[in-house]
Amino acid sequence: MPDRGGGPPTGPRIRVGRPSRRVRTLLLTLGVLAVLAMAFTMFAGFWTDWLWYRSVHYSSVFTTTLWTKIGLFFVFGLLMALAVGFNIWLAHRLRPPLSAMSMEQQNLDRYRMGIAPYKKWLLLGITALVGLIAGASASGQWRTWLMWVNGVPFGQKDPQFKLDVSFYAFDLPWYRFLLGFGFAAVIISVIAAALTHYLYGGLRVTSPGARATAAATGHLSVLLGVFVALKAVAYWLDRYGLAVKSSDFKATDNWTGLRYVDANAYLPAKTILFCIAVICALLFFATLWRRTWQLPVIGFGLMVLSAILIGGLYPALVQKFQVQPNEQAKEAPYVEKNLAATRDAYGIEGTQVAEYPGKSETKDKTKLRDDADAAASVRIMDPNIISPTFQQLQQMRNYYAFPTNLDVDRYAKDGKDQDTVIGLRELNLAGIPKKNWINNHFRYTHGYGVVAAKGTQVDSEGRPVFTESNLPSEGDLGKYEQRIYYGEKTTTYSIVGGPQKEIDYSDDTGEKTFSYKGDGGVDLSNPINRAAYAAAFSEPQILYSGAIGDGSRILYNRTPKERVEAVAPWLTIDGDAYPAVVDGRIQWIVDAYTTTNGYPYASRTTLGDTTADSLTANNNSRAVVAQQNQVNYIRNSVKATVDAYSGDVKLYEWDTQDPVLKTWKKAFPGTVQDKGEISKELMAHLRYPQDLFKVQRELLTRYHVKDANTFLSGSEVWQVPDDPTNKSGDAVPPYYLSMKMPDQKAQAFSLTTTFTPNGRDNLSAFMAVDAEAGTSDYGKIRILKLPTSTTVDGPKQVQSQFNSEQDIAESIRLLRGGDSEVEYGNLLTVPLDGGLLYVEPVYVRGGDLKYPLLRKVLVSYGGNTAFENTLDAALNKVFGAQAAETEQPPDEGDDTTEPPPTSTNPTVREALSDAQKAFDAGQKALEQKDLAAYAEAQKDLEEALQRAEDAQAKADQGAGGKNGDDKNAGDKNSGDKAGSDKAGPDATPTGDAGGGADTG
């Protein structure tokens, strides 16, 4: 019969006693080891951070932030612990004597008896917990504290309260933090005190008689009085907060500042509520003498009712019956304040807006053609498309790579600046032959060399004209340190300088090795350092590997942006760091901003959204992804450099008038160098930053107007057009371009964009900023505003026109033959003699090609469109005239003109002649739309060009080496077959694709 549990146990009893001594010792040892491991891991994080900051010579940043956080943690943690602990202790001390116990008190007595032996420990535990939480929260306010302590006046006052802007930017955030801390301390104290009073009989719920003792009533009323007093302070600060309050307003998104209803309803309401709250607080304090809740409850109810009626209903009535019937007249004075403040806060107050006809009245076609060359050095090398071309022609080894988006800079040649597309041959660990810990972190440690090409020219095959190429790199840039230990693609750590040799680069003779000799990184000779990094990187081999020895240094935090962010955590970093060769070193140049969201009356914007465009959508490294907080003041106050070899970070003051930068310089003295320390060579490569320009252009879609009524009507609202060459629907990116605005006498390196009317595609304005640092006009924004009475095609319409013209569409279809892919380059806009010139390079990536080559150039002006092999030819066709003949100086290494017939090698001459014949035959077939003949001609062209290149290479070797043309064209060092470079359709053996001053 089964056991029902009612009888005595039938089996042997199992004794559960204390663990044996050995088990207890083992458990204790494991516990101690676990605690030590956790402690050492925490120490390792702290110690490695300290070593890193010391290695980059910014240890003061580490110590300042550390001590500030520690100070805030202990001060506010202690204040919170004392406030809560004191009120718990006081509530316990004020407990009533227990006599006749009700059922409620009998139930509570069990809890009182249970915690009696642990009261002190419980009190310490509660106060420690709330203190830790409060201290951790306060330590996160270290920026707010430093800005309040070191705040520098702006020298400008808000139009409502006549207070310096620094009050809103530096003081008000700290006061609000203190207020929030006070509320938290009081609320927690009230809850803790009420629970203690209830536990010990000071408050009763079901017991007969008074619900609260006099002592409990007095204690809680004082706490509630403090709470209401803090609410009075909050009402008073809210008055000033109206100047930086965001609200919905039809005139603009993210409106900031007072409007009519704020100044005439909310502002007096806040003042009245402040007075009521003060009276209510006094009534709560009065219960110490009156011992009754009647008056405080009445006062508190009055305050709540007033908040609803005066703070909510009254402003709504003012808005409904005073503002809405006559909104334009009521809001106009406040809109004027917002216009002035926003334009000043974003640095757009000096924007020069000029009327521009949009259509040329010039009848002289020859003049138009000549002016087109003078108006801009049109960049037909799109840095956002030709990275695969750099990769194929100049990668050299699989463990090198170029960035997805190349950069545009200026380099002087023969005393003249030329727009240059530049990229670094960085390390690509994904391409190393064999992956293991030694290869990943010891042997393959750095990239090698700069590759640069002219932005305005291509060679006869549509490839870049390299001004710096090969491995090691050689060309116009001269001698410089080519090793790249710090770059945008270098995201893992490397250990260098020790017994293990590094792969430097490879050539035809084999691999070259190298050992790092710089002072970058942290020394690993110390075993404590090795143990700390082994723990920090979760890699025990760092501790015991024989590949680490005397002189070994660990390099990490190697991208330019993260290095600048680490040494200047108070700066906002631009999304695009770019390289430049400066004083014999490769320097990464990083633009950095100071921001605040406390500029009164200035509308806010979100950097992460405002700076997004068609480039950042597909390349997160270019986006300001961390900046989703809103700001309403921004300055490009710092230019930073990061040495690609040593990793040295230098911060240079750029905006010498910025009060936010002055504040941070006081907080971190010695971290930012004076503007005068910028060398002349570095100054030549500084430029106007893209992200600041994108923020400003977004604001200028509305804030280009200065009249309040026009602003309110929204009749002149613009928008940044979508990128017409991209189907993503993202905004068109701004473009760097050497060009000339109507009021300029010569071309200037500029950053440009276009605007269209809101919801429409025609052009409404063109905007350019002088981007060349060191010039008197640097940062000057010019807007050409087109008349609303005439319609000028915008970028999307021009692109549609390109695609819809029958001849162009047919040519594009032919170019797409044979599995080829057509890619449209940047659609550039250039003001020209009252009209607007559009230029768009067209690239073809053949079915058997891995990279795009320039094949055609689209040009549009005044409704006329051309689709030709070269920019010159397209301009000639659009204007119906040729440019005036100008003598071009010889440019060594240029392969942009017709293949020279001066070769003494008959094989070369014969091959070039055959190539020209094949090219002519292909063009004729293209015009006749004979695909079969066109394909045959392209095959003949490829064979002829291959024969010419092979013959020329043999001739060069016989003469003692390769010539400059081979270098610029990208020779066999790229590892690809030369014939594949010409396999794309419509290869052009003659003509120059360049334009402007560099065309020939």
Swiss-Prot record:
The chain crosses the membrane at residues 26-48, 70-92, 121-143, 177-199, 220-237, 267-289, 296-318. Residues 888-897 have a biased composition (Acidic residues). Residues 943-953, 963-984 have a biased composition (Basic and acidic residues). Residues 884-908, 943-1000 are annotated as: Disordered. The keyword Cell membrane applies. Keywords: Cell membrane, Membrane, Transmembrane, Transmembrane helix. Belongs to the UPF0182 family. This is UPF0182 protein SCO5204.
